[in-house]
Amino acid sequence: TGIMVALFLPLVVAQGVAALYRDQFDLSATVTPANELHLTLLYLGDTSETEYDAGQLFEWLSEWAREQQPINGKLNGVGKFNSVSPEGVPVYLSYDSPELPAFRQSLVDFFRSKGLQLEFNHGFTPHITLAYTPNYKDGWLIDVPQQEITFGEVVLAYGDAHFVASLGNQSGFFVTKDAQGNY
């Protein structure tokens, strides 16, 4: 029931990454399915707590996205956060892009200009959560090769619905899950 703006890994890339890490976690881990691997740009709260509907947020996101260019970068290593959630230690894949901080700040500034009250509990660390594991061991690593990735679209996830806005001067669209749970 959450709302976020995110960059989703292209499915073929996500499936390749998932093949490298899915067997590295024990059964107590909550592993992110390949079709849900994403880099969160903004978390906007819960659908039950917002005055904005998906249509309004997507209209704004599309307006912003038309003025942006695709983001280039690379997958660049695996890490963990020190905070522990009820599911365990978050283990993530990093995404390195010199363009990403300004891109994300532009999005923050744009949504604030529309009147959204955005609150941040910590700084922006670009990451793609692979799993939450209660049994994390120091020194444990997953070897994910550096891979160039260009994100050409940004996604508004509003509950279970995904709305996709192309970066640059293209139209966006609404996406639903198929029978296998893929978008």
Model-flagged regions — what are they?
Residues T1-Y183:
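Histidine-dependent nucleotide/RNA phosphoesterase domain, centered on the 2H-phosphoesterase fold
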